[in-house]
Amino acid sequence: MEGCVGEESFQMWELNRRLEAYLTRVKTLEEQNQLLSAELGGLRAQSGDTSWRARADDELASLRILVDQRWREKLEAEVQRDNLAEELESVAGRCQQVRLARERTVQEAACSRRALEAEKNARGWLSTQAAELERELEALRAAHEEERAHLNAQAACAPRRPPAPPHGSPVRAPEVEDLARRLGEVWRGAVRDYQERVAHMESSLGQARERLSQAVRGARECRLEVQQLQADRDSLQERREALEQRLEGRWQDRLQATDKFQLAVEALEQEKQGLQSQIAQILEGGQQLAHLKMSLSLEVATYRTLLEAENSRLQTPGRGSQASLGFLDPKLKPNFLGIPEDQYLGSVLPALSPTSFPSPLPNTLETPVTAFLKTQEFLQARTPTLASTPIPPISEAPCPPNAEVRAQEVPLSLLQTQAPEPLWAEATVPSSSAILPELEEPGGKQQGHFPDDLTSLATTLNPHHPTLEAKDGESSGSRVSSIFQEDEGQIWELVEKEADIEVKVENSSAQKTQESGLDTEETQDSQGPLQKETLKALGEEPLMSLKIQNYETAGKENCNSSTEGHLGTLEGPEKEKQIPLKSLEEKNVESEKTLENGVPVLSELLGKEDTRTEDQELMSPKGTLKRFSSLGKESQEVVRPSKEGNLESWTAFKEESQHPLGFPGAEDQMLERLVEKEDQSFPRSPEEEDQEACRPLQKENQEPLGYEEAEGQILERLIEKESQESLRSPEEEDQEAGRSLQKGNQEPLGYEEAEGQILERLIEKESQESLRSAEEEDQEACRSLQKENQEPLGYEEAEDQILERLIEKESQESLRSPEEEDQEAGRSLQKENQEPLGYEEAEDQMLERLIEKESQESLKSPEENQRIGKPLERENQKSLRYLEENQETFVPLESRNQRPLRSLEVEEEEQRIVKPLEKVSQDSLGSLAEENVQPLRYLEEDNCINKSLLEDKTHKSLGSLEDRNGDSIIIPQESETQVSLRPPEEEDQRIVNHLEKESQEFSRSSEEEERVMERSLEGENHESLSSVEKEDQMVESQLEKESQDSGKSLEDESQETFGPLEKENAESLRSLAGQDQEEQKLEQETQQTLRAVGNEQMAVSPPEKVDPELPKPLGNDQEIARSLGKENQESLVSLKEKGIETVKSLETEIIEPLETAEEDLERRKSIDTQEPLWSTEVARETVEPPEDEPPGSLGSVDENRETLTSLEKESQELSSLGKWNVETRVEDSQQCLQVEEGLQEEQHQESLREVKQELPSSGNQQRWEDVVEGKAVGQEAPLATTGVGTEDKAELHLRGQGGEEEAAAEGELLQDIVGEAWSLGSSEPKEQRVPAEALDNLEGGALEVPVAQSMPEVTERDEDRAQAGEQDSIEVTLGLEAARTGLELEQEVVGLEDPRHFAREEAIPPSLGEESVKAKIAQGLEGPGKEPKEAGALDSGILELPKTSSEALECQGHEESESMEGWEEEEASLETSDHEGSDAPQPRPPETEEDEGAQAALTAPGPKLLEPCSPIPILTDAHELQPQAEGIQEAGWQPEAGSEALERVENEPEFGLGEIPEGLQDWEEGREESEADDLGETLPDSTPLGLYLRSPASPKWDLAGEQRLSPQGDAGKEDWGPAVPAAQGLSGPPEEEEEQGHGSDLSSEEFEDLGTEASLLPGVPKEVADHVGQVPPVLQPACWDQGGESDGFADEEESGEEGEEEDADEEGAESGAQWWGSGASGGGCKVQDIAQRGDPVQESVGVSGLWDDGLRGAAANVPALEMVSQDSAEPSGSEESESASLEGEEGQVTDHLDAPQEVTSMVPGVGDAFDIGGQSPNLDSEQVNGKMENGLEQAEGQVVLDGDEDQELLLQGQEVGALKVPLVASPVHLGPSQPLKFTLSGVDGDSWSSGED
C-alpha cells in the first residue's frame, strides 16, 4: 500500500509539476495573446475609426464615381464628336450646295451675257431697221411732197387752160380727190406702221436694257455670295479642325485620367491583397495560438479531471455515499448512459465525480465557462477515457428536450450526445438559456470556432453524431437561420420549454445546493455580476470575466473550503444563483414588458441597446426567450450558435467545475492552497466586486456604459487575480467575437460565421472592429446619405439603398428584438422608416437609438419602470404609449426639426434678404403653431371666442411647456440627433437655397421676359388680349418647360430632401412632443384622453402625421399632380409605392382613407381630425405647424418648382378644369372642393407666385401700371385695359389654378358666368366682372343689398352684376386670396419697405415691376406731397402685386385672354393676380407654404375664419369699391388703410357680429375721416382726401386707388368707376357665374371682382356674408347694417365649424347663387377653400389670434407687420391665391384678393396683404414706403391701438371677425378704412396673424 501510495504520490507530484508547467505556458500564452490583442488594437486605432476596408471601399466608391464621371464625360465627348461630325457633314452639304449655286450662278451669268449680246445685236438690228424705215419714210414724204407739188402745179396750171367742157372738169376733180385721199391714207398708214414699229423696237430695247442690268446685278450678287460661301467654308473648316483637335485632346486627357484611375485601382487592389495576406497571417497566428491554448486548457482540464477522480476515490465515505447518490441519481444517470466518453466529457466527469456532480451541475447551469467548455471539449477530443468508470454507450433515444435543444441548435455534439438524457437536456437548456445571454455572441463565434474543432473532435470522439456536429460546425449560422426561419414558432415553444426546464433544473439544483451548505452571498454576488453583466452588454468581456469569475470564484472558494465546503458553496450558490437568476429573469421580463409597453420604438432603435437588452433578457431564460424569440432571425441565429457554444462551454464548465470539486483531499488541498495563495482576497474580492458589479448593474440599467466600465475594471481586477486569465481571455475574446457577431448581425452571417469558425480571438476582435467599422461605415453612409440626401438622386439612391440595407438590418434586429413589444410600432416605424427615402430609416433609427438609449436609461430608471409598471398606464397607455412614444419620438423631433427647418427657412429667407420677415414669420409660425391649435379647438368648441382665448392660453402654456419640454428633450436629442439632422438640414437649406435661387433665377428670367413682354404690353395695353395671351402663353410655355424641368428636379430633390426631413422632422418633433407630453403632466393628463383620441386619430390622421410625406405628398401630390399632372403623380406614386411597400399596413389602413379622404382629411381632418389631434396633442399641434414649416421650407422648393411648374400647372389645370370639376364633384362637393380648391389654391398660389415671379409679375405689373396710369385718366377704360392685360394673366393663372379650383367648385358656374361675364365683360368689362361677382353676391343674395349700400352706381352695376353676387363670393375667395396676397403683397411691400423683403420681392417679383414698384414705392415713400407718386407707388405696388399676380396671372395667362374682354376684368384679375401674384411671387414660399401648411392645418379648423377671410376679401372688394367711392380709403387705405385696416380689423372684432356693421361703419367713417386726414398727410396735398375716400375720378385717387387697386386697382378703379359696375355686378351675378363657369373668364371675374369691390362697399359685407354667412341676407346692406354677420357669419360659423360651409362653398362653387345661398357663395366657398387652403394660414392665424401678436407687432411696426403679414400673408395669400386659383375664382378671388388686399391692408394679415397686395402693396411697395410711412406710421399708431384691441378681439372675435367680416363689410361701406376695420377684425386679423406669424 505504501509503495502504491508513494507511487501515486509521485505520479501526482509529476502531474502537479506538469500542471504548473502547463499553467505557466498558459499564462505566457495569455500574456502573448494580450500583447497581440493590444498590438492589434493599436493597429486598428491607428487605422482610424473606419477600417482599411471602409477606406478602401470609400476610395473605391469615389474612384468608381470618378470613373463613371469620366465615362459620362467620354460619352458626352463622343456625343459632341458625333454632333460635330454631323455639323461637318451639314457644312459640307452646304458647301456643296454653295458650289452648285455658284456654278448655277456662273451659268446663269453666261446665259445672261449671251442674252445681253443677243439683245445688243437685236438692238443694232432694230436701230438699223428704224433708220431704214426713217429713210423710207423720208423718201415717201419726199415723193408725197413731190406728188403734191406736182398736183398743185397742175392745179395752178388748170385755170390758165381754156376751161374744160363743163362735164369734163367735174370728173377730173373727184378723181384727183380720190387719188389724194388714197395717197394720204396710204401715207398715213405707212407712217402709223413705221411709228408702231419704232415704238415696239424702243420698248424691246428698254426691256433688253433692263434684262441686261438684271443680269449684271445677278452676276454681281452671285459673285458676292460665292465669296461669302467660300469664307464660310473656310471658317467652318477651321472650326472643324479646332474641334477635332479639342476632341483629340479631350480623348487623350480622358485616356490619361482613365489610366491613372486604373493604376490607382490596381494599386489599391494590390494594397488590398497585401492587407488581406497580412490579415490572413495574423489570423493564422492567432488561430495557432488559440489551438495551442485550447490544447493546454484541455490538458489542464484533463489533469483536473484526473485529480478530481482521485479525490473522489479518496474522499470520505460520506462523499462516497454522496457520490453513489449522485451517480445513482436517475436524473444524473441518463447523462452518462447514452453518451460515449469521447462524445461528452461532461457525462464522463459527472460519472467520475458523482459526488460533486449535484453541485457542479447547477453550478455549471449558472456558471458560464466558455473557456472551460472549449477546453473540456478539446479534452473530450484528446481524452478518450478520462475515468476508469466505464460509461456504457447507449444509443441516443430521441428525447423531447433533446429535440427542443436541437431545434434551437443549442448544443452541438454535447446536446446531441446527451439529448436523450432528460436531466442533461434540462441542464443543457437552462445552461443554454442562462449562458445564452453571456455566450450569445461568443456562442455565435464559439459555434463558429468550435464547430470546426468540435467537428473534428466529434468525428473522432463522437462517432454517433459526427455529421450532426459537422453540420453544427459548418452550417451553424445557416442552420440557425434556416431552422429559426422554419421553426420560429417551434423555437419559441422550445425556448419556453427550455425556460421551464431551466427553472426546474435550477429548482432541483437549488434544492441540492440547499442540502449542502452554500455560501449563497458569494455565489449570489458572483451570480449577480454574472447575470447583471450578461444583462449589461452584448457579451462583453466583463461578462466573460464574470463567467470565469463565477467559475473561478466558485472553484476557488470551494478550494478554500473543504471539498464538502466546495460542494456546499457550489450547490448553495447554485440555488441562490438560480434564485437571483430567477429574480433577475423576472425583473428582466418585467423590464422587457416595460420596454415592450413603454419603449417599443426604443427597442427598435438601438441595435446596441437592443443587443444589451437582448443579453439582459437572455440571461433570464423567460425574458431571454421572449426577447430572444422576438429577436430577428439574425440575432437568433447568432443566439443559437451562442447557445450551442454556451451549452458546450457550459457542459465543459460543468465537467471542470466538478473537477476541482473532485480533487483528492491532499492534492485538492494543495491546489486549494495554491488557489488561496493566488486568490486569498479573491473570494472576498469576488463578493465585493460582485456586489459592486451588482450595484453598477442596477445603476447600469440607467447607465449601462458607466457600469460596464466599472464592471470591466472589476472584472479586470478579478482576471488579474485569477490564475485562469488565459482561459478567460479566450472566453472574453470569444464573447467579443460573439458581440461582434451580434453587432454584425446585420452583416452577412456567413462572414461572421467564417470568422467565428476561426477560433482566433484576434479575428474575433478584428471581426468585431470590422463589423463595428462596417456598422460605423453604414452609419456614416447613412449620415452621408442624410447629408447627401439633397445630392443627386442617383447617388442618394445608391446610398439610400445602402442605408436601407443597414437600416433594414438594424431595424430588423431592433424590430425583431422588440417584435412582440413593437410589432405594431416596429412595423409602422419600420414601414415609416422604409418610406420612400430609406435614409429616413437611418436617421430615424439613429434618432430612435439615441432616444432609445435615453429612454432605456429613463425606463431603466425606477421612475420609468414605475411609470411603465403602473397598471393604468400599462393597460390604458400600452397602445397609447406606443403611439405617444412614437409621437414623442416624432413630435419632439418635429419640434426639433422645426427649429432647424425654421433655421433653414430663415437662411433661405436671409438668402432672399428676408431674414427679418422669415424670423417674424417663424415667430408668427410659432405663434401660429400655438394659435393654430386655437382655431382648431376653436372650431371644436362651441364658444369659438372664449374657447379660442382659452385655447390660446392653454396652447400657449402647452406650447411653452412643449417648447420647454421640447427644449429639454430636444437639447439632448438634438445633440444626438442634430448630428444626423443638422447636416441634412444644412444641406437641405443649401439645396433649398439653391433651388430657391434657381427658381428665383427662373422666375427672374421669366420676370425679365415678362417685363419685356409687359413693357410691350404697356405700350400695347389696349391691344387685343389675344396677343397678350399668346405672348404670355409663349412665355408660359417656356417657363413651363423651364419650370417643369427645374420644378421636377426641385420637386424630386426637395421631396427627397424634405420628404425625409419632413418625416424625420415630423417623427423627431413628434417624439419630442411625445416626450414633452410625457414630461408635461398637464399634457399627460389632458392628453391621456387626448392620446386615446390622438391615437385613434393617429390611426386615422397620424398616417398623415406619421407619414407626413404620404398624406402631404398625397394631398400636395394631388395638388401638384393635378397641377403638374402625371409627373408629380408619378413621383407621388413612386413615393406612395415606396411608402406603401414600407408602410403597406399604414397606407393600406391609412393611405387608402387618406387617398379617399385625403383631400377631405387635408382640409377636414387637418381641420377636424387635426383639431382634436392638435387639441389632444399640443406637441403634435406644435409639430404640425412645424411640419407645415418644413413643408414651408419644402414649400419654398415646392413653391419654386410649383412656381416653375405653375405655368405647367396652369395649362394642366386648364385641361384639368373639366376633370377637376368632375373630380371635385365626384368627391364631396364641399370637402373635395375645399380640399382640392385648397390644394389647387396652393398650387395656384404657387403657380401665381411663379407666374408673378416669372411672367405676370413684370408684364401684369407694367400693364397694371399702364392700366393704373390709364385709369388715372380714364379709370374704367384703363381698368378695362389693365384688367384685360392683368386679367389675361390673372385669367391665365385663374384658368390654370383658379381654373382648377373653380373648375372643381365653380367650373360650370365659371363657364356660365364667364360666358355672361365675357359678354358683359366685352361690353362692360367692369360691370361684367362685377356682375360675375355680383352673381356670386346675388346668388348669396347679399351682394345686391351691399350694392345698394355701396353706391347707386355700384347698385346699377350690381344690377348688371346681379350675377356678380356669385362673383362676390368669388371675390370673397379672391378677397381671401387678395387678403392672402395682400398679406403676401403686404409682406412684399413691407419687403419693399424692408430692403431684405424688397430684395426678396425683387428676387421673386423683380420682373413684377420691381422697378415700378421701387419707383412707385419711392413715390409712395415720398409722402402725401407725392400722393400722385404714392398713387403711382400704389400703382407700382399694385403692379408689384400684379407682378406677382402677373406671374400668377401669367399662370393665369387665360386671364389675359379674358383681359381682352375687359381690362377691368383684367384689373380685377390683376387685383386677383396681384393677390395671387403676391401669393405667387411670395418670396417666402417656404414660410408661405409653412404658413400655408400650418395655416392650412389651422385652416381646417378655421372654415369660419375662411369665411371671415372671404368677408375680408369682400371688404377688400368693397374697400376697393369704396376706395372708388372713397378715394381716401384707398389713399389712406394704402398708407393708413393697412394701419387703420389693422385698427379697424382690431376694432371690428370688438364690434362683434352685429356691432361691427354699425360700429365699424361709424368707426370706419371716423377712420375714413382719420384716413382722409392721414391720407391728406400721406397723399400729396394736391390729392383731396375725398378723392381717396370717395372720388374715383380724382386722378390722385385714381393713381393711389388704381395703383393700390392695381392688384385691386382695377377693382378699385372699377370700384371708383366700377363702383357702379359693382352694383351692376350685384345685379349681374350671372355674368360672374358665367365668368366663374368660364374659368378663364377671370377678367370678367376680375371685373366682377371690381364690380363686387364696387359692390363690396356694401358688397364686401356681401362677400363677407357670402364667405362668412354665405347667406345673401348677410351680404345685404340691412344685414351689414344690422351686422349681417349674424346671418352670414352665423351661417358661416355653423357651416365653417360643421363643414357645412365647405359643403355650401362647394355647392356655391358649383352654383354662384348657391354659393351665396348655400351658406357660402362660390367666392365664399372658394374663399373657404382658399381660406382652408390658403386662408387657413390667415384663418388659422386669425383663429389662433396670432393676429393679436401680429397686430401688436404690426401696431408697433406696421411696415414690419406688413412684411411679416406679407410673409404670412404671402403664405396665406399664396394659399388664398392657390385656393382662389383652385377655386377657379382666381380672377374673382384675385379681385377679391385685390379688394381683400385693400381690406387686408385694413386687416393686419389680409389688410396688410391687401395694403401690400391689393392697395397697400402699392402702398407698401410705393406708398407703404411713402404713404405707408405716412399713413402706416399713423396707421401703425392706430394699428397699435386697434391692433392690440383687434388682436384681443381677433383672439376672441377671430371667429367673430369671421362672423363679423360681413358686418365689417358694412363698415366697409363707410369707407376703405371700414373694410380695413372689417378685414382686420375678421380676415385681416387672420391675415395679420398669419402675416405676423
From Swiss-Prot:
Region feature Disordered, mapped onto this chain? 150-172, 437-479, 507-529, 556-879, 949-1130, 1155-1222, 1237-1263, 1336-1369, 1388-1824, 1870-1893
What GO biological process term is on the record, naming one?
cell projection morphogenesis
Domain IF rod per the UniProt entry, residue ranges: 8-314
Q: Where is this cross-link: Glycyl lysine isopeptide (Lys-Gly) (interchain with G-Cter in SUMO2)?
A: K1136
Q: Give the region (Coil 1B) as residue ranges.
A: 56-151
Give the start-end ranges of region Coil 2B. 197-314
Where in this protein does the record say Phosphoserine is found?
A: 312, 356, 359, 562, 620, 685, 729, 817, 903, 1005, 1049, 1145, 1166, 1216, 1229, 1322, 1570, 1594, 1686, 1695, 1772, 1774, 1866, 1889-1890
Compositional bias annotation for Basic and acidic residues:
572-595, 606-615, 634-646, 670-681, 717-730, 761-774, 802-818, 846-879, 949-966, 989-1051, 1198-1212, 1241-1253, 1354-1363, 1393-1403
Q: At what positions is Phosphothreonine found?
A: T316, T389
Query: Which residues does the annotated region (Linker 1) include?
Result: 44-55
One GO molecular function term of this record is: intermediate filament binding
SUPFAM superfamilies linked? Intermediate filament protein, coiled coil region (SSF64593)
Maturation and modification: Constitutively phosphorylated. This increases during mitosis when the cytoplasmic intermediate filament network is reorganized.
- Name the residue ranges with Acidic residues bias: 1458-1469, 1561-1576, 1688-1709, 1773-1788
Query: Where is it expressed, tissue-wise?
Result: CNS stem cells.
Q: Tell me the residues on which N-acetylmethionine occurs.
A: M1
A single GO CC term for this protein reads:
intermediate filament
Location of the region described as Coil 1A in the Swiss-Prot/TrEMBL record: 8-43
Q: Which family does it belong to?
A: Belongs to the intermediate filament family.
The subunit structure is: Forms homodimers and homotetramers in vitro. In mixtures with other intermediate filament proteins such as vimentin and alpha-internexin, this protein preferentially forms heterodimers which can assemble to form intermediate filaments if nestin does not exceed 25%. Interacts with FHOD3.
PANTHER family per the UniProt record, alphabetical = NESTIN
Q: Protein name, please? A: Nestin
Q: Which organism is it from?
A: Rattus norvegicus
Designated gene of the protein: Nes
